[in-house]
């Protein structure tokens, strides 16, 4: 199951590449029904309708996740601008640069099982527990126990977004535009990808040393005894991705309508690498006894691919007059998407066991489990929308729309699975007794298919009040219905028997062929999700240069209006404009 879910998640990520990274508070507070300056600045042809110089910084809160009064945010550096003065006649441009580098300590909880309270903390916790005992009741300490624990749980994220948009008016009714985008992202964490010895899935890294020994210096009559146990889990997962976008657009702009064509190309690479190690070592020095177990899980998932999209939009205008603050329009859009990418996936689990007991008998075991596939994927997608933006009067703007997106991606390729194990037994460490070798191999064709459809219906309302019309209330809702169908199929073309070969010291050999049940899962499921999100906000047009906006006034479960939690949850945006 783990392999299939991972494969399908990459398909979903690829099909949704380059979702918009910045949004205006007008758009967010009306459920996506009404657009603001930021949406226009990102559109290669609508950019030309912006006038003046618009400046964006960290105070603009374009991610809508910063809570200024709580001093809580995404810790990013943001610099952006949109201008109609680009030193070339009839050319307008916008530039956005966003960078973040965040190291986040994660929660740690561990019960050492020694009668003490569980260890708790964040990031890294180091603790040492010690105990002295008198086991023979002669009023002298003769037994020492200690447990030293180092626990780590952290996450690091880096991301850089760069967007350049240019819009040029070729003639009175024709605008050409271009947008370039580059996103580089990286993420690393030290949480286990699967169960390994002491660790469950998503457990944090650990290093635990337990010592138990007799204290002959404290009590000379006690016998010599010393035992050491070390449990260690060192987990590492890193994900890096790079995406480049190029988009060209053209708009034929007439008095009552306009027609726009967008052609977009996206190229991306993604690499996911996991190297998880878990080990346990137990040694009793006085008896020359030890057990050494090591487990290593290595996963590499890489893909590179391309998405090409063609989209057209027809927009009928409700002519702007002095009566309305914003013009209205009815927009119809239809698009087509094709995606192609190559993927390579490998997953190896290596297990080693070395054991010497009190009689110098030795037992060793090495087992390897490998799975891999190479596949090519092709995808087709269709999208369409209809959006009505209508001024009900000189103070009220209504926005309502419907968006539909259907996407299908099919991946086909070859897979291989192998299992190898070797076990040996010795007496007196070097006197070989027997060995057991087990092996099995399977290969075949793999087909992974993902079908997704999303229907979104936003409704938004904006009302300007007070005599000077400097204040506006905004309300919005977004209904979304998402259906996902996931399928996977392994069709073996070769399966060798799972063979067990026993070889004894007298030279005899026994070979057994065991029944084999494939560990590779075939999957087919359908998931339907319905959701409705409500949004709201306030806008204050302080003057022609400064606009202050608020988003998300009330948090869920917060029934009190003016309290500390309410104030700290406010999300504000400051927008600057110069003529």
Regions found by a protein language model. Name each.
Residues 15-117:
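N-terminal, post-signal peptide beta-strand-biased segments of exported outer-membrane/organellar beta-barrel
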Residues 4-14:
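Sec-dependent N-terminal signal peptides
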Residues 27, 48-56, 78-82, 90-94, 161-167, 173-177, 247-251, ...:
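Outer-membrane beta-barrel architecture
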Residues 106-113, 127-159, 184-245, 264-311, ...:
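Extracellular/periplasm-exposed beta-strand and loop segments of Gram-negative cell-envelope proteins
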Residues 540-542, 566-579:
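Outer-membrane beta-barrel "beta-signal"
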Residues 83-89, 168-172, 251-256, 316-326, ...:
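Outer-membrane beta-barrel strand-turn architecture
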